[in-house]
Amino acid sequence: MIEYKNVALRYTEKDVLRDVNLQIEDGEFMVLVGPSGSGKTTMLKMINRLLEPTDGNIYMDGKRIKDYDERELRLSTGYVLQAIALFPNLTVEENIALIPEMKGWTKEEIAQKTEELLAKVGLPVAEYGHRLPSELSGGEQQRVGIVRAMIGQPKILLMDEPFSALDAISRKQLQVLTKELHKEFGMTTIFVTHDTDEALKLADRIAVLQDGEIRQVSNPETILKAPATDFVADLFGGSIHD
């Protein structure tokens, strides 16, 4: 379990997060949603210590995150960004191999897992493994990014607006794929988006942020039927749902 306890972050005169309390269960798909500047990405970056809170603590399995070895923490956490961060001079296979190599996997183990995961995301290794990122579409690059984040079998997968720059068809395909992989591998997924439709589609629970504070945490059905504040009601008022 991941737990934020009274977490705050302050830059000079600006409160980025204020008294954030949130529990994320093992294996849960938690979506953080809110407008730009609401603190979503800040919360995400605190999990692998890219940012440190000025007050409060974040716990993983009962232990403060700041007490974990930083390298081991990051190797146990997958990260997928909006900006597709593949190394341009490395092939698809070489990009994917980076984390397993750091973990000391054999070449055979890396090759087997790479082939397995690329097949799952619809990119057969025989066809795509030797390609450079420049030879892939945006959607294909993001699929490789997902494989790279997952190949090390992380306990936690962090996804920061990973599909917002993609076309509608690619975005929908990757939403379905991400949910399927989350269920198959049983990891805890924390997903940041400003898109309420995406949040409703993916989440087990949604945490709604405004001005550095959490306004509501609940499942999608409750968010729609019983919004806790006018802000939550307005934010989800235009959402398209079944």
Swiss-Prot record:
It catalyses: ergothioneine(out) + ATP + H2O = ergothioneine(in) + ADP + phosphate + H(+). It is found in: Cell inner membrane. It comes from the Bacteria. One of its GO terms (biological process) is quaternary ammonium group transport. ATP binds at residues 34-41. Residues 2-236 form the ABC transporter domain. GO terms for cellular component: plasma membrane. PANTHER family: OSMOPROTECTANT IMPORT ATP-BINDING PROTEIN OSMV. Belongs to the ABC transporter superfamily. This is Probable ergothioneine transport ATP-binding protein EgtUA. It comes from Streptococcus pneumoniae serotype 2 (strain D39 / NCTC 7466). The lineage of its organism: Bacteria, Bacillati, Bacillota, Bacilli, Lactobacillales.
